[in-house]
């Protein structure tokens, strides 16, 4: 793959710090490749276990001539009271482990600081995940501009920005069931308090961690967003203004994965043979398959997963159902075989136990809809593939993303999930959508009503504008140029 040479007196050197969770790492590796294609020297700093997950994709990028360097730092699991190898969020099972994980992450400050000190050429810019607040201190110490990456879209980022400045709105609510309207917003949008990713109830041991993140956000030089202007124009404009002009939409970054093998291995090697998967899809009618995936950190209880399975079966439509974190669901595996579910659906249902080649599946012509947890990466991949979505948010920014997809973009059908899946309280929450609810929502999404046809038309249109945004002359391609010019001017004035 050719990359554009930087005809500047010295090359820019960006150091990237991905947070160790799949939804954060995947787009950051894509960003590394996008910047390297523009002639920027890239160093990615991560831990051994996480480096292994991206080895194949990065090796292919490096072999194609892209200037990417991967540096590994030892993960201090012992000091934080974790097991060896627990280096990624999807390997944690309790809230206590997550607290310990953040403790371990912040212990990386010293070894990383030593790395930066000895780096040559000197870094021109740090791009850090929002969860790695320690990088702010390093940026300050070495006087390097730090760009923040949140992994969210402009709609959600603006919502968080507005609510942090108007916190009394959340404080004055009488209960977690009461809805409020987000003020100063381009559209009338309502949420309950738990549905927005703003720090309201802070669990024990988290106050300092969250305060550090908010402070790191405030002191960063700017923000890059995995979105594109044409998707959420009013929100991109308002968010850029809120960040004094230093916000660049450069997505969908997943579109840097142009070859099949990169699409298939994006994030983690798949647990299904790529050819087997494509063969199954090839045997189905165009637009007939529903792809079902609730993300890498799905915490639905067994009772809810059974209802989802039965609803998919009763919909009588072909589907692919991805269940990640398979080890956690031993009872589900037993139910699949003992209840005869697997036998009954074998002709029209494909179960993927573990990782799936998501981008490859979504871009296949047989797929006509996407049942998603509305994580931002998945939402954007659905949009990029031009697919209407059935939305089933769990937590974090996912209720915000659902609102964008269903209410603003009008390319989604809601499964009508109103309650946030709190870690450790899943069983207590129980079933939120029964099999009838699942069947009804699938029919609404995949059926032939006028509304369904209009959703498909709009989704296809958005998919086309996503591809145009990253092409030369497109809004996201141009924004990368503006970002590089900004950092180059800064580097020259500092010299």
Swiss-Prot record:
Biased composition (Basic and acidic residues): 450-471
A Pfam family reported for this protein in Swiss-Prot or TrEMBL: UDPGT
EC number: 2.4.1.-
Span list, region Disordered: 449-475
Keywords: Glycosyltransferase, Transferase
InterPro entries the record matches: UDP_glucos_trans, UDP_glycos_trans_CS
Enzyme class, spelled out: transferase
Name of the protein: UDP-glycosyltransferase 73C6
Gene name tied to this protein: UGT73C6
């Amino acid at each position: 793959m050719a990359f554009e040479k930087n005809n500047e007196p010295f090359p820019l050197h960006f150091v990237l710090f991905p947070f160790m969770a799949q939804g954060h790492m995947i787009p950051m590796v894509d960003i590394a490749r996008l910047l390297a294609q523009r002639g920027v020297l890239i160093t990615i700093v991560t831990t051994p276990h996480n480096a292994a997950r991206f080895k194949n994709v990065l090796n292919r990028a490096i072999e194609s001539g892209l200037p990417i360097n991967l540096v590994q730092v030892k993960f201090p699991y012992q000091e934080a009271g974790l097991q060896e190898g627990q280096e990624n969020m999807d390997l944690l099972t309790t809230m206590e482990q997550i607290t310990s994980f953040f403790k371990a992450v912040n212990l990386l400050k010293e070894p990383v600081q030593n790395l930066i000190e000895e780096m040559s050429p000197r870094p021109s810019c740090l791009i850090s995940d929002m969860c790695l607040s320690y990088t702010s201190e390093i940026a300050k110490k070495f006087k390097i501009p730090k760009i923040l990456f949140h992994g969210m879209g402009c709609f959600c980022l603006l919502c968080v920005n507005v609510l942090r400045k108007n916190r009394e709105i959340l404080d004055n609510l009488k209960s977690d069931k009461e809805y409020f309207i987000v003020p100063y917003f381009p559209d009338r949008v309502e949420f309950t308090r738990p549905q927005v990713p703003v720090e309201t109830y802070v669990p024990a041991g988290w106050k300092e961690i969250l305060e550090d993140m908010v402070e790191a956000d405030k002191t960063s030089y700017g923000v890059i967003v995995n979105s594109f202007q044409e998707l959420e124009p009013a929100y991109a404009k308002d968010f850029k203004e809120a960040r004094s002009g230093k916000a660049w939409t450069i997505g969908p970054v997943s579109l840097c994965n142009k070859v099949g093998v990169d699409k298939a291995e994006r994030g983690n090697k798949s647990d299904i043979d790529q050819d087997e998967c494509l063969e199954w899809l090839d045997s189905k009618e165009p637009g007939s398959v529903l792809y079902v995936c609730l993300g890498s950190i799905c915490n639905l209880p067994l009772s809810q997963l059974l209802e989802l399975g039965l609803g998919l079966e009763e919909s009588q439509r072909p589907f692919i159902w991805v269940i990640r974190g398979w080890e956690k669901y031993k009872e589900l595996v037993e139910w699949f075989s003992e209840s005869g579910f697997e036998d009954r659906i074998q002709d029209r249902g494909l179960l993927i136990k573990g990782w799936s080649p998501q981008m490859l599946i979504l871009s296949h012509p047989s797929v006509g809809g996407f049942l998603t947890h509305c994580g931002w990466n998945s939402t954007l991949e659905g949009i990029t593939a031009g697919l209407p979505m059935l939305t089933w948010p769990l937590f974090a920014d996912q209720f915000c993303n659902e609102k964008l997809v269903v209410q603003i973009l009008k390319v989604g059908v809601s499964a009508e999930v109103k309650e946030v899946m709190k870690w450790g309280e899943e069983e207590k929450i129980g079933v939120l959508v029964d099999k009838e609810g699942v069947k009804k929502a699938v029919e609404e999404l995949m059926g032939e009503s006028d509304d369904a046809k209009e959703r498909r038309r709009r989704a296809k249109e958005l998919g086309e504008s996503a591809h145009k945004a990253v092409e030369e002359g497109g809004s996201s391609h141009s924004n990368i140029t503006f970002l590089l010019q900004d950092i180059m001017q800064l580097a020259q004035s500092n010299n």
